[in-house]
Structures are given as structure tokens and as C-alpha cells.
């Protein structure tokens, strides 16, 4: 002991141990230690109070430090692996190719204004506007290119849980849902005026998404909105009338998340019953169920057609599905800390393990090669589909749980002009709304008459640390 500790350190250790024995009502042990050290330690009541709890604090500090060291070693190992797999040529190509772009810390912008945790983010399909919802009951509109707050929208009386841009052609709207049981529609072209409130759910509304107009047979051509709720239902709304046109029953617990397919034909939902469901919008029937998670399912994502070659190979298929098909593959994230990837029949393809806490949100890279996930472990993880979902990057920039992630919509280049709300009317370029930025029935490089899709290398995340972060190339 004398070789490891100075006399003063040894004395403080003895005092801490004796104080611990006394606080734990072990006077005999304290007396025995005093006798062993020849009662050289003077410990009156005030001194004992000073040292009480010090031993426990030292112990827990060591445990926390050990965990931090292990986390840093794992991070160092991941970075070393990434460095080893990169050559100057591949790095140069990756930096220039949007298909291979992945976010890096630090974020380009850290947007601060919310007073409570950020629950959701959404990009405007045309302009550089980013909406964020928060438990502080507000929605904030930011210019993500400049990193500036444009306006604060008030109207909900409880936490705003989700936000989404979409709506009919030529009339982009912002939808929000809340723990106050309502969905609200806001008009970006009229200073985000609240144009409609949709009541009907019997409990908190946990997710809201516009259903894309999509392919032939898709009803009402972009006028539909889907919501998920703690009342165990999904509701489909006509945004032009405000009426609920269909209620979907099937889940037996809180429905946490829902996303539509790019062609508007299917919905994918999941929640606290640990079951994900694929729904046919036209019939309202469940097409497939997905079973396997051991805890609540927090989030879902539909894989865009650009992922099909990678996922078909993992599923053992010789030929991928045609790009015109939708909802061929899906992903779910859960409080069991795993991500699961499935085919449309409910067959499990891959289980992704790596997060140390609840998985809160998922988004596929528009280029098709990566899946990004965020978690209560404060990280963004990037999984490479071409390497059987190997985690190739861990981004640690947040200081608390990361609650949401969205990718900026793709841009259609040389596809005709755009009106104020995204309607095509001349020459120019148009940002692409919808799920994962995919045009239903179109090829990535030729979506209708020579237009090309330009991937925007921009993502946004929200966190319990009250910040919205924008990562961009």
C-alpha cells in the first residue's frame, strides 16, 4: 500500500473506509480497522460526516470511467476499421459521390430555441425550410442552409409529437400531431396559418404522414394523411375536407409509428404490441405481420427501390424486384436495442445489433447503400447494406438521447419549373417530396422525360438536449 499511496492518500482512504463502516452501522468493523492501523486516524463526528459517502462516490466514478474508456476504445476501433478500409482514391470518390455520402461530426448547424426535448423534424419539399416539433408545444421553422430560426408556430396545447410536409400538388402543407389528441394543418404559403384541426383520436397522436399521390389506383391523389395513435388505431384523413375516411383496427396496443409507401398503396405501422403491420390502403386490410422484437417497436422505415439489389441478395434471391414495385422490404427499430430488416411477407432477413439503448428512428439513404439509425445511446449509426449491414460509422455529436432523423428530399433536375408550393410550371428544378425521395414507378436516373434525381446530402436530427442538428456535405 505504501508503494501505491502517499501517506496522505492512505490516511484519506482509511478515513473513508471507517466513515463507510460507521454510516453502514458496522461499528465493530470500524473499531477493528482503527486497531489495525494503531488508531492513527483521528475521526471526529464532523470529519466522519465529511468523508461519509466518499468511498461510494470514488467507486462509482471508477465504474463510469471504465465504461467511458470501453466506449472510447470501441469508437477508436471503429474509426481504425474505417481508416483501414479507405484508400486515397476511395476517399476522394466518396467525398464527391452523393450515393456514398454519410454524415460526420460535428454538425454544420446546431439549432437552439426549443425549451423542451425535440420530438420530430421534417424538410420542406422545395425550400430550405426545416420544421421541428417539441415537447414545449411549439413547432419551429428554420432555414437549414443558414442555420437561422424563421418563425415559431403555436397552437397545440400539449407536446408536439410529429411533423410532416406534403399534400396535394401545388399546395404543400405542414401537418403536426400532438398529445392534445389533435392533428393540425398549417399553410406555409400563408405564414403557416392554421387552416384545419382534425379531432377524432381518443388518445395521444404519435405519428402523422402525408400519403403520396403515387401510381394509378392510389386514391384521392395526394389529399390523404395517415395518423397513428395511442388509442390503438390508424386513421386516414382527407385533408381537403378534414374528414376521417377510414379507421384501421388491428394493433392491440399504442401505435408508435407509421409510414406510407412511395406509391401510396401501402402503410407500414408498429407499436407497443411488438408487431409491425403492412396495410393495403384501398381495402384497409392487413397484408402482412412482422413478429420477432422482444420489446416495444419505436420506429419503422420502408426501403426505397435503390436498396433492392442489396436486400434481394441478402434474402437469397437471384434477381431483385423491379424498381416499380413498392414495400418490398421494411425495417423496424425497437426498445430491445435491435433493428430488424424484413421482406414484405414478414420473413426476417437480418437483425442489426450495435446500439446500447432504445432505437428511436430509422431512415434509408436515398442512394440505397446505407441505413441510418438514431438511438437513446446518443449516436447515429450508419449500416452498410453492401457489407451485410456492417456498421461502418458511428456519429456522436448529441449530448442526450437522439429522438428523430430525416433526410432532405431529392431534387428533380431539369424536370420543369416549380411554383410557390412545388407545382411544376416551367424550367428549373424541383425538390421531391414523399417517402425517401423516390418517384413511384420511376428509375433513379430518369424519372419521366429525362429528369434526373439529385440526392441532397443533408440530414436533420432532434435530441432530448433541446437541439436540432443539421449534417450536410
From Swiss-Prot:
GO biological process, one term: cell division
PROSITE patterns reported in the protein's UniProt record: LISH, WD_REPEATS_1, WD_REPEATS_2, WD_REPEATS_REGION
Coiled coil: 60-87
Database matches in CDD domains: WD40 (cd00200)
Region (Disordered): 80-99
Subcellular location, record wording: Cytoplasm, Cytoskeleton; Cytoplasm, Cytoskeleton, Spindle pole
GO cellular component: cytoplasm; microtubule; microtubule associated complex; spindle pole
Residue stretches making up the LisH domain: 9-41
Gene3D superfamilies tied to this protein: 1.20.960.30, YVTN repeat-like/Quinoprotein amine dehydrogenase
Signal peptide span: none
Main location: cytoplasm
Family: Belongs to the WD repeat LIS1/nudF family.
HAMAP family: lis1 (MF_03141)
Functional summary from the UniProt entry: Positively regulates the activity of the minus-end directed microtubule motor protein dynein. May enhance dynein-mediated microtubule sliding by targeting dynein to the microtubule plus end. Required for nuclear migration during vegetative growth as well as development. Required for retrograde early endosome (EE) transport from the hyphal tip. Required for localization of dynein to the mitotic spindle poles. Recruits additional proteins to the dynein complex at SPBs.
Name this protein carries in UniProt: Nuclear distribution protein PAC1
Organism: Blastomyces gilchristii (strain SLH14081)
Organism placement in taxonomy: Eukaryota, Fungi, Dikarya, Ascomycota, Pezizomycotina
Name of encoding gene: PAC1
Amino acid at each position: 500500500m505504501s508503494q501505491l499511496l502517499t501517506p496522505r492518500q492512505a490516511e484519506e482512504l482509511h478515513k473513508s473506509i471507517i466513515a463507510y463502516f460507521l454510516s453502514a452501522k458496522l461499528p465493530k468493523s470500524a473499531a477493528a480497522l482503527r486497531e489495525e492501523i494503531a488508531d492513527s486516524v483521528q475521526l471526529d463526528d464532523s470529519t466522519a460526516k465529511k468523508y461519509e459517502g466518499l468511498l461510494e462516490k470514488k467507486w462509482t466514478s471508477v465504474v463510469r470511467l471504465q465504461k467511458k474508456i470501453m466506449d472510447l476504445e470501441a469508437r477508436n476501433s471503429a474509426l481504425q476499421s474505417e481508416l483501414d478500409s479507405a484508400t486515397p482514391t476511395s476517399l476522394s470518390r466518396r467525398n464527391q459521390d452523393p450515393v456514398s455520402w454519410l454524415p460526420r461530426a460535428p454538425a454544420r448547424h446546431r439549432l437552439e430555441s426549443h425549451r423542451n426535448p425535440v420530438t420530430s423534424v421534417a424538410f420542406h419539399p422545395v425550400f430550405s425550410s426545416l420544421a421541428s416539433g417539441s415537447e414545449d408545444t411549439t413547432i419551429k421553422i428554420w432555414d437549414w442552409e443558414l442555420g437561422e430560426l424563421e418563425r415559431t408556430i403555436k397552437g397545440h396545447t400539449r407536446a408536439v409529437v410529429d411533423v410532416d410536409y406534403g399534400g396535394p400538388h401545388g399546395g404543400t402543407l405542414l401537418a403536426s400531431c400532438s398529445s392534445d389528441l389533435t392533428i393540425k394543418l398549417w399553410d406555409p404559403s400563408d405564414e403557416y396559418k392554421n387552416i384545419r384541426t382534425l379531432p377524432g383520436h381518443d388518445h395521444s397522436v404519435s405519428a402523422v404522414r402525408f400519403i403520396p399521390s403515387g401510381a394509378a389506383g392510389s386514391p384521392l391523389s395526394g389529399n390523404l394523411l395517415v395518423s397513428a395513435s395511442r388509442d390503438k388505431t390508424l386513421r386516414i384523413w382527407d385533408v381537403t375536407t378534414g374528414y376521417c375516411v377510414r379507421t384501421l383496427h388491428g394493433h392491440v396496443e399504442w401505435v408508435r409509428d407509421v409510414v406510407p409507401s412511395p406509391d401510396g398503396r401501402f402503410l407500414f405501422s408498429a407499436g407497443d404490441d411488438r408487431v409491425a403491420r403492412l396495410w393495403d390502403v384501398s381495402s384497409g386490410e392487413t397484408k402482412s405481420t412482422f413478429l420477432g422484437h422482444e420489446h416495444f417497436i419505436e420506429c419503422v422505415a420502408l426501403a426505397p427501390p435503390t436498396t433492392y439489389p442489396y436486400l434481394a441478395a441478402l434474402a437469397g434471391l437471384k434477381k431483385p424486384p423491379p424498381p416499380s414495385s413498392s414495400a418490398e422490404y421494411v425495417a423496424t427499430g425497437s426498445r430491445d436495442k435491435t433493428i430488424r430488416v424484413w421482406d414484405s411477407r414478414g420473413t426476417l432477413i437480418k437483425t442489426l445489433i450495435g446500439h446500447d439503448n432504445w432505437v428511436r428512428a430509422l431512415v434509408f439513404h436515398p442512394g440505397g447503400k446505407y441505413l441510418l439509425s438514431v438511438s437513446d445511446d446518443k449516436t447515429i449509426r450508419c449500416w452498410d447494406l453492401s457489407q451485410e449491414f456492417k456498421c461502418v460509422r458511428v456519429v456522436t455529436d448529441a449530448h442526450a438521447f437522439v429522438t428523430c432523423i430525416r433526410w432532405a428530399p431529392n431534387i428533380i433536375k431539369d424536370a420543369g419549373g416549380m411554383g410557390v408550393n412545388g407545382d411544376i410550371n416551367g424550367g428549373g428544378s424541383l425538390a421531391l417530396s414523399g417517402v425517401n425521395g423516390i418517384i413511384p414507378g420511376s428509375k433513379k436516373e430518369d424519372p419521366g422525360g429525362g429528369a434526373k434525381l439529385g440526392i441532397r446530402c443533408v440530414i436533420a436530427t432532434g435530441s432530448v438536449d433541446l437541439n436540432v442538428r443539421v449534417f450536410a456535405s
